Curated annotation (Swiss-Prot):
Protein name: Uncharacterized protein MJ0988
Pfam families, A to Z: DHH (PF01368), DHHA1 (PF02272)
Residue ranges of the region described as Disordered: 284-303
Gene3D superfamilies, per the entry: 3.10.310.30, inorganic pyrophosphatase (n-terminal core)
GO MF, one annotated term: nucleic acid binding
SUPFAM superfamilies: DHH phosphoesterases
Amino acid sequence: MELLEYLKRDEVLFLCHHNADPDAVGSCVALKYLASQLNPNGKFRISADSVSKLSRNILNEIGERVDIEIYPKLPETVFIVDTASINQLKVNFDELKEREVILIDHHKKTDLADICKYYIIKEDYPSTSEIIAEIFKELNIFPPKNVRIALLCGIVYDTKHLKLANSKTFELISYLIKDISFQKILYLLSQESDVSKRTAHLKACSRMEIREFDKLRIALSHVSSHEASCAKTIVSIGADVAFVVAVRKKEKEIRVSARCRKHVSKYVHLGNLMEKIGKELGGSGGGHSEAGGLNAPYDKSKSKEKVIKEVLNLCYKRFVEEYKKAKQN
């Protein structure tokens, strides 16, 4: 297996995306353990510019850590894990291109793969943690309890508490769950949302504009943070599609999260849509059929309000175009 040769390197950095979720963190924890087994004298660490509250709870439970840093020092070998586009990382891109980059992901393949020496992308897997768990199984290496907890949390989180699970998912859960209470996994993933997230949800709903097209309820809104969670919440309370924009002046960045119901994804793949819109805005995007996101630079010559309006109108326009095109075929 070619992957093992890269894991055996003397120094490896495992990179998570912004606000690293349990799938990203669980996958990195497992890869770091595997690398340490293959090269006991190696130097291995995990880095992200931020991690989610749920991920922090899991890391505390299993006694692992993620170094929180922007523009980390890059060793010769860098693993990028559970990340759809380069804009989800706070790294020196020119420096990264000169490194030995390995990508393991379950999102739609994007330009990020072009700079990689080696990559494993399995879009049909509901989580990256399942890809990693399968690697352990193929190698006949049974991971320790803390690593299995991390992988199980990643799987359950990214499958929306098994709503997106398939038969392979349950096979891998059965493989990992020995001596672990499933109730414990659910508990680690059900910590109450912090006040800032709940406040963002309320603001997103209060600012929401609903447009109707072909009997679809398309919700457009904006917040300062937690845009992905807000988009998910808006769909859960009745929208067919939701686009939520967050403009971060300090980081000079625009973020958009999109979510939709399953019947909509039969016509429009949100990951593909976000990739196209991301490029149109001078950034990048990607994701899955029912969930996508993009990052793009923020032009400070325009007001925040104007940018929000322009981006939401663009998302609506491009979605309608793609939907019409799909229905005609």
